[in-house]
Amino acid sequence: MPKPKDTFIPNTPDELTAAWVGEALRGAGETCTVDDIRVEPLGGGVGMTGQTVRVRIEGDGAPATAVAKFAASQAQTRGITESYDSYAREIRFYERYAERVPVRTPKYLGADYDPGTHGQPGPVVVRIIESLPVGVKRWISRNTVKYLRPTKRRYALLIEDMGDAGAVYG
């Protein structure tokens, strides 16, 4: 669920704290305490639209590890991804639907994100664009990416660490 703007929400792996991880876990229904965390790189490189890290958790009743996901640090990647509201959509998927999907998905362990609107155009803009000639639509499509800018919204998602999925599914 979106949080009030004055709520602390980590925006990068460096901002992740044991207090936030504990609050996120308890907010998702876990009964636990979190005394300390250690953040390790996970994934990265080609095909990533955000920052993903493994979190080693010390505490009573807490999972030993989790995966934390944040928005991309690269402005253009973040701007494009935010224009489709992808970060908030991913969080909403885990909050609302992941348990109902008939394939194995990581368990939702908690999340926070700023309220706000995503960058999708309204119905009037869509009608105007649909009425344009094909060549103009192509030009808009090719050149719009240059003008997308990231917002200051913060997104933090905590999900189950499924380990080496390649070993399981590879």
Give, region by region, the residue ranges found by the protein language model.
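Conserved ATP-binding subdomain of kinase catalytic cores across diverse folds
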Residues: 40-170
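Regulatory N- and C-terminal appendages and interdomain linkers associated
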Residues: 1-48, 56-65
